[in-house]
């Protein structure tokens, strides 16, 4: 891989990003990096994010050939300085160019939504693995899968990687023979221009509800919605859950850049939806069976363009929850648009396991434990409502906390969800407190709970102890919900990632200890 200065500057000019160049020489970069620790001879270095000038000095010492920044730095004296008006946009464009535009060799399905992205991504990944004979890459909150060998599978750091990492991983996937990619796209990826210039074959919009609003994230819900909608603007075909909040706004955003024949809408049968203009629901689904182990639903095409995909049928999923049926429907339709058949979905959906998403742990005498990433009002409410419908006897205990430094709206949201669904017991605990006091966060959540409806609330800031307390207090017919962290193997505390065994491991180990 390499990038010559002449086409690089032309690309920046084309997108009106180039301000000026100092110390221009004729060079070809043989490496790109925003991390000074990874710089080697011939590297084009990007000064981004929480940049400190000493990083540029280090990059220069290690052999950086030039740097890209929004201003010149004395530490880069003597190096060609490519000065741009938006560092993140420039890095995305030049990263794609350096890696030879690998996105052009992939059929890309991109997924956004406040909740359900990871579940939908795994459903689609399994369907397409069947239809493409395992030529499918996956970029999710949990994993980055670039090929079929063990060394091609990694745990993810971000829902959507930094642009240089994203295009590097796409290049590796293409070189490994992958033909399709399923990727989650976060609102922050658009807010921070990590994916500027990237286009998708199919863009899925699952839902939107208040989340990620606060300092260090989105200043308003309108900004959050706008960033989510950018996925549709950049997709050749758009697939929208018509039951989402702000549906009319979302639909018109898609329609502004996409022909009506390339917009597909789906909804649960009987859903109360106001359709704008001449919009039609293309697919509807209805639940046939739901329990604590699986869901079964029927999918029906209603329009001619939908019928051409031949996806009508009955499907089972191994991930329980009626709300996950909508995620499965999105995956089925998107995979159909990528060439998969109904049979590909039928054969795979009932064998999908997603770590930390409705993960069930059985015990002999301490009830059933569910570990789920539910981390906002909408996801917690839907999870508790589903479990209550499935529970004929016994109590429900919820263990949760809220993150510090961001997502402030989650705290009243948790209080509201708990008040509405009225679990029998709640243990408020720690969940990535950052630079905030976890007890202060817990008491803020508690302040939004109606104590006439939720009477039994405890505070236990050691999350492992909180989980053990919940299990200790449960009997055979009870349910314990461990919400918010899923499979996260760390707690973010005072700027550090402190290792954490994961909710799943703590629960399993403790049950084994109690029942051996």
From Swiss-Prot:
N6-carboxylysine carried by residues: 228
PTM statement from Swiss-Prot or TrEMBL: Carboxylation is probably crucial for Mg(2+) binding and, consequently, for the gamma-phosphate positioning of ATP.
Keywords of the record: ATP-binding, Cell cycle, Cell division, Cell shape, Cell wall biogenesis/degradation, Cytoplasm, Ligase, Nucleotide-binding, Peptidoglycan synthesis
Uppermost EC category: ligase
Keyword presence, Transmembrane helix: no
SUPFAM superfamilies named in the record: MurD-like peptide ligases, catalytic domain, MurD-like peptide ligases, peptide-binding domain
Subcellular locations according to the entry: Cytoplasm
GO MF entries: acid-amino acid ligase activity; ATP binding; magnesium ion binding
Pathway: Cell wall biogenesis; peptidoglycan biosynthesis
Gene Ontology CC terms, in alphabetical order: cytoplasm
Subcellular location, principal: cytoplasm
Binding, UDP-N-acetyl-alpha-D-muramoyl-L-alanyl-D-glutamate: 36, 159-160, 186, 194
EC number, as in UniProt: 6.3.2.-
Residues that coordinate or bind ATP: 113-119
Keyword Nucleotidyltransferase: no
Name of a matching Pfam family: Mur_ligase_C
Gene Ontology biological-process entries: cell division; cell wall organization; peptidoglycan biosynthetic process; regulation of cell shape
Family recorded in the similarity comment: Belongs to the MurCDEF family. MurE subfamily.
HAMAP family the record matches: MurE
The protein's role, per its UniProt record: Catalyzes the addition of an amino acid to the nucleotide precursor UDP-N-acetylmuramoyl-L-alanyl-D-glutamate (UMAG) in the biosynthesis of bacterial cell-wall peptidoglycan.
The name this protein goes by in its record: UDP-N-acetylmuramyl-tripeptide synthetase
Organism the protein comes from: Limosilactobacillus reuteri (strain DSM 20016)
């Amino acid at each position: 891989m390499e990038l010559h200065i002449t086409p690089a500057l032309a690309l920046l000019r084309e997108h009106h990003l180039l301000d000026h160049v100092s110390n221009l020489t004729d060079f070809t970069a043989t490496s790109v990096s925003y991390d000074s620790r990874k710089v080697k001879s011939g590297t084009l270095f990007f000064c981004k994010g929480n940049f400190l000038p000493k990083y540029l000095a280090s990059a220069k010492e290690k052999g950086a050939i030039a740097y890209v920044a929004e201003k010149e730095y004395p530490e880069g004296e003597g190096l060609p300085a490519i000065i741009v008006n938006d560092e993140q946009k420039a890095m995305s464009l030049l990263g794609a160019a350096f890696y030879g535009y690998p996105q052009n060799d992939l059929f890309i399905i991109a997924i956004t939504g406040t909740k359900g992205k990871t579940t939908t991504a795994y459903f689609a990944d399994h369907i397409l693995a069947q239809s493409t004979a395992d030529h499918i890459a996956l970029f999710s909150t949990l994993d980055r899968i670039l090929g079929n060998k063990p060394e091609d599978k990694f745990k993810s750091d971000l829902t959507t990687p930094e642009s240089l990492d994203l295009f590097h991983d796409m290049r590796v996937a293409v070189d490994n023979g992958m033909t399709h990619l399923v990727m989650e796209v976060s609102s922050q990826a658009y807010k921070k221009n990590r994916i500027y210039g990237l286009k998708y074959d199919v863009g899925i919009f699952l839902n939107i509800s208040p989340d990620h609003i606060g300092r260090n994230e989105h200043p308003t819900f309108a900004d959050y919605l706008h960033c989510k909608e950018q996925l549709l603007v950049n997709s050749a075909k758009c697939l929208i859950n018509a039951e989402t909040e702000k549906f009319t706004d979302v639909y018109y955003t898609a329609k502004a850049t996409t022909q009506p024949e390339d917009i597909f809408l789906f909804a649960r049968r009987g859903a109360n939806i106001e359709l704008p203009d001449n919009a039609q629901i293309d697919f509807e689904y209805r639940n046939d069976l739901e329990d604590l182990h699986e869901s079964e639903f029927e999918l029906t095409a209603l329009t001619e363009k939908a019928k051409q995909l031949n996806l009508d049928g009955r499907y089972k999923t191994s991930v329980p929850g009626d709300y996950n049926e909508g995620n499965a429907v999105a995956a089925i339709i998107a995979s159909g648009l990528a060439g998969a058949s109904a049979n590909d979905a039928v054969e795979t959906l009932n064998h999908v396991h997603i770590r930390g998403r409705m993960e069930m742990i059985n015990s002999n005498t301490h009830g059933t434990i569910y570990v789920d990433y539910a981390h906002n009002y909408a996801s917690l409410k839907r999870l508790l409502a589903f479990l209550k419908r499935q529970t004929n006897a016994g109590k429900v205990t919820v263990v949760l906390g809220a993150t510090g430094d961001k997502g402030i709206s989650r705290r009243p949201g948790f209080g509201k969800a708990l008040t509405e669904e009225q679990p029998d017991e709640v243990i408020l605990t720690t969940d990535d407190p950052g630079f905030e006091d976890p007890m202060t966060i817990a008491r803020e959540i508690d302040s939004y709970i109606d104590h006439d409806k939720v009477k039994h609330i405890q505070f236990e800031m050691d999350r492992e102890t909180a989980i053990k307390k919940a299990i200790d207090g449960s009997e055979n017919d009870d349910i314990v919900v461990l919400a918010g962290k899923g499979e996260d193997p760390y707690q973010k505390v005072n700027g550090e990632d402190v290792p954490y065994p994961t909710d799943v491991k703590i629960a399993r180990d403790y049950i084994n200890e109690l029942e051996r």
